[in-house]
């Protein structure tokens, strides 16, 4: 906000959830309301570099040495086979739980339908999952109807310019059309005429007209490279993978649940999902589902959890120990970070005798 203005000059005050009886007043609005009024900075936090750090620490490897062309890694985006488990054991047809950008139910459904087989296909998936009106009612229908496959739908904004140039349109016009489509402004009648004159398929033109926002390919590439690296560890050094995931993003990891075995974890997931359908589950419980799915996957892969040990457990790190995962003090429900750190400090001063 410029120094000479107040935020209230741009955001009329409102009550949360438009409740006039609330005593709280906020200036929080959807960013689209202010999109053309003030500059918005997207300062996003990323935990991937932190996960890299722990992967290297727990495995004594370098994440940058992971190859981008391992066929087994790509198989993970199509089935559970690389994990050595059946779909029934983890309640999922593919093995991407815990893989950033590819581990949500939405993106997993896309993977199942699109069946990506290469890095380029995964770029398409990443672009489709981050765009607006690009997948649902658009690329998804084209794939379902057999009109084209994942390799040929419009996945990232760069595709439009490159495709149009390949069809023979002038570079400058191809760029202009890409910019208009990616911003949701569609096509002019003149552009449509030019595209048809160069034999651009009708389905492609129709797809362009539906798009509201498109993801850039370079951004998608960064996400896919991270996903490939993490998928490699998940397959080949699973203990390091799970320890890193739980350490960096525990998402309510509860030792009292994890230590009760696979069936109890499965029952807990089903209970939360059932209550969430009835709008009875808390946001904290819902956010813990992704962690519970990984815990269940550990059990399916015969990876054990070791109980909290006063001498061996870390305050917050999940540690590899003889092919198993040693739980930290922070995984105890109700034990805060400071209390966990204090236990470690006391242990370092002198051993516990009782």
Task: Walk through the language-model features, giving the residues of each.
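Noncatalytic, beta-rich nucleic-acid-contacting surfaces in large DNA/RNA-processing enzymes
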Residues: 1-354
């Amino acid at each position: 906000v410029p120094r000479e203005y107040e935020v209230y000059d741009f955001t009329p005050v409102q009550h949360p959830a438009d409740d006039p009886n609330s005593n709280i007043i906020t200036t929080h609005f959807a960013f689209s309301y202010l999109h053309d009024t003030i500059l918005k900075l997207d300062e996003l936090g990323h935990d991937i570099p932190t996960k890299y750090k722990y992967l290297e620490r727990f495995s004594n490897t370098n994440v940058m040495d992971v190859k981008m062309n391992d066929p087994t890694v790509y198989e993970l985006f199509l089935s559970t086979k690389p994990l050595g488990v059946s779909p029934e054991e983890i309640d999922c047809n593919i093995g991407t739980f815990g893989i950033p950008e590819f581990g949500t139910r939405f993106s997993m459904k896309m993977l199942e339908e699109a069946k990506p087989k290469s890095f380029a296909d995964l770029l398409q998936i990443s672009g489709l999952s981050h765009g607006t009106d690009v997948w649902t009612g658009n690329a998804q229908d084209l794939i379902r109807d057999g009109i084209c496959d994942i390799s040929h739908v419009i996945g990232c904004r760069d595709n439009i310019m490159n495709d149009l140039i390949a069809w023979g349109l002038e570079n400058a016009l191809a760029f202009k059309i890409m910019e208009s489509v990616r911003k949701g402004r569609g096509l002019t009648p003149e552009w449509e005429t030019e595209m048809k004159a160069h034999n651009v398929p009708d389905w492609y033109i129709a797809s362009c007209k539906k798009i509201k926002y498109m993801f850039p390919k370079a951004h998608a590439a960064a996400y896919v490279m991270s996903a490939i690296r993490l998928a490699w560890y998940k397959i080949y050094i699973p203990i390091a993978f799970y320890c890193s995931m739980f350490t960096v993003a525990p998402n309510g990891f509860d030792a009292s649940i994890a230590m009760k075995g696979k069936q109890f974890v499965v029952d807990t997931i089903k209970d939360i999902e059932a209550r969430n359908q009835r709008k009875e589950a808390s946001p904290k419980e819902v956010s813990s589902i992704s962690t519970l799915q990984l815990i269940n996957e550990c059990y399916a892969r015969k990876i054990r959890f070791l109980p909290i040990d006063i001498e061996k457990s870390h305050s917050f790190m999940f540690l590899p120990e003889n092919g198993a995962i040693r739980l930290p003090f922070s995984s105890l429900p109700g034990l805060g970070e400071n209390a966990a750190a204090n236990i470690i400090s006391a242990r370092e001063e002198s051993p516990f005798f009782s």
